[in-house]
A protein has these predicted regions:
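Local sequence-structure signature of Cys/Sec-based thiol-disulfide redox active-site neighborhoods
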Residues: 153-192, 197
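Residue-level detector of functionally pivotal "anchor" positions at catalytic/ligand-binding pockets or at interdomain
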Residues: 36-49, 150-161, 414-441
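Terminal connector regions
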Residues: 120-155, 394-411
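Intrinsically disordered, low-complexity Pro/Gly/Ser/Thr-rich segments with frequent PxxP/GP/PP motifs
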Residues: 90-120
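Terminal processing/anchoring signals of secreted or surface-associated proteins
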Residues: 1, 171, 226, 420-426, ...
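C-terminal tail/sorting-segment detector
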Residues: 3, 453-464
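Bacterial Sec-dependent N-terminal signal peptides
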Residues: 1-28
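Short, conserved sequence motifs used for protein processing/export or organelle targeting and
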Residues: 31, 35, 39-48, 52-55, ...
Length: 464
């Protein structure tokens, strides 16, 4: 349900202020002055934003839930009083008082933490959060309330975000997508599941012919195309906002993936575990798709179309550090339009069921505390000679909600040696750190490095 806050200031912007005053940094103050003259500006007025689903762990005393508050009045806010109303049980609680560490200024929006108790059983419960008083006075906001869906779970879910980059060596715009994907994977290693799909170029010739079959035509009519959970086509070299939006859509379906080489070192055995933190809605069915990816791919013959004049310009001065490779004249050949020495990461080598999950992986009718598993195998991996370093192979597992067609969750893991203990996914700190010195493109540096930024034993280091 869409709820709109209608206040005096919004009416002023629409009907009172002339066009030359209706925008710009002074518009809020101008509207406030006019409202004060005509006596329609509220003094104590705070409205919350609806956060959607919030997760509360059963057994915990309470959970500090983040909520955003906006001060629509002309008085700084030092405290609010609020109540809870559980719509299912028709029970009220409160009032409670929240004293702010710093006053909330007029026009300011700020996130605060509201303690909420979990339910007595797993599942969803609708909660009305209502701000009754501001600074000890009646709350004048026309919509001083917000509806929350409280999800009581047996364990807090972890959400992995699938980021798919479609690229081609023949495309001089594609470095933007490559940089964006590498950067977001570096910035959020515990939360991003990155896959780079190449379209009709030298890499597409040396990976599986069936990789992402049908999906390239659907999602990459033009490239670059960076999709976040296939819901949001992100643009530019910074896709942080798109990532955060998807990350905020918390799932209640946890998943973990584990992979190991077989005894011959040619096949990868994969096992995925799916555990609901609370029971899914009736009729919901889930299925799993898989991608085998490899990083550190390079070839002396490869050339990536680029544009030195573009990527070395001020337009990219705030770009992630990965863009420096394309802004370095030393990497260019063929008249400043192609780069050599590129290292490609997260490349999709082979995939299974990445349209909407494998048929034999479908899962439904979950019971409380039940963990469902699925296994698959990537066979004949040694035939992909483009993979020079087997330690940089990863398996990505993607959980699809087949009822909604949406991606519910994603996870990734490295491939362990046969017979070794499995590792937990999404915990990069548990993975073996790469020894030696590497440049920012992932290439190992032999001999004494020139001054610059390098990865030394897994840590970023400035060598002078």
């Amino acid at each position: 349900m869409k709820r709109t806050i209608l206040t005096a200031v919004s009416l002023l912007f629409l009907f009172v202020l002339p066009p030359h005053l209706s925008a710009g940094p002074r518009s809020w103050q101008q509207a406030q002055k006019i409202a004060e003259r005509i006596g329609c500006w509220a003094k104590n007025s705070v409205a919350p934003m609806t956060p959607g689903n919030v997760f509360l762990k059963m057994g915990d005393k309470e959970t500090a839930v983040p909520l955003k508050l906006t001060n629509w009045g002309d008085t700084e806010v030092t405290s609010i009083s609020y109540t809870f109303y559980y719509t299912d049980k028709q029970v009220s609680e409160g009032p409670f008082v929240l004293n702010l560490d710093q006053p909330l200024k007029d026009g300011e929006t700020r996130e605060v933490k509201i303690p909420i108790k979990p339910g007595q059983k797993l599942g969803k419960e609708e909660l009305l959060f209502n701000i009754t008083q501001v600074n000890g006075q009646y709350n004048e906001a026309s919509a001083g309330y917000a509806y929350l869906t409280c999800c009581t779970v047996n364990k807090m879910p972890h959400k992995g975000v699938l980021v798919e980059d479609y690229a081609g060596m023949w495309c001089w715009h594609c470095p933007i997508g490559l940089v964006a994907t590498d950067a977001i994977a570096r910035m959020y290693p515990d939360d991003v599941v990155a896959v780079s799909v190449h379209k009709t170029d030298d890499i597409s010739k040396v990976v599986s012919r069936g990789v992402y079959e049908g999906l390239i035509d659907r999602y990459a009519v033009t490239v670059p195309a960076v999709w976040v959970a296939r819901d949001n086509k992100a643009a530019g070299f910074d896709i942080t906002d798109a990532f955060k939006i998807e990350k905020s859509k918390v799932t209640y379906m946890n998943m973990e993936v584990d992979a190991e080489w077989d005894e011959n070192g040619n096949n990868i055995r994969v096992k995925t575990q799916v555990e609901p933190c609370m029971l899914p809605d009736e009729g919901e069915t889930f299925a799993i798709g898989y991608v085998m990816t490899a990083s550190g791919l390079s070839d002396d013959k490869w050339r990536q179309e680029s544009n030195y004049a573009e990527y070395s310009s001020d337009s990219y001065k705030d770009a992630p550090e990965e863009m420096k490779f394309y802004a370095d004249a030393a990497n260019y050949v063929e008249g400043w339009s192609q780069v050599k020495g590129m290292v490609y990461n997260h490349v999709a080598i082979e995939s299974q069921g990445m349209d909407n999950g494998l048929e034999d992986s479908k899962m439904t009718d979950f019971r409380a505390d039940e963990v469902k598993t699925h296994s698959t195998t990537f066979e004949g991996v040694n035939k992909y000679s483009v993979i020079r370093d087997r330690s940089k192979i990863e398996i990505a597992a993607v959980l699809f909600n087949t009822k909604t067609g949406k991606i519910e969750n994603a996870a990734r893991c490295s491939v362990r040696n046969h017979g070794t203990t499995g590792i937990r996914p999404n915990l990069v700190q548990e993975q073996k750190k790469t020894e030696g010195i590497y440049d920012m493109q992932g290439r190992k540096v032999n001999g004494k490095p020139t001054p610059g930024i390098y990865i030394v034993n897994g840590k970023k280091t400035v060598i002078r």
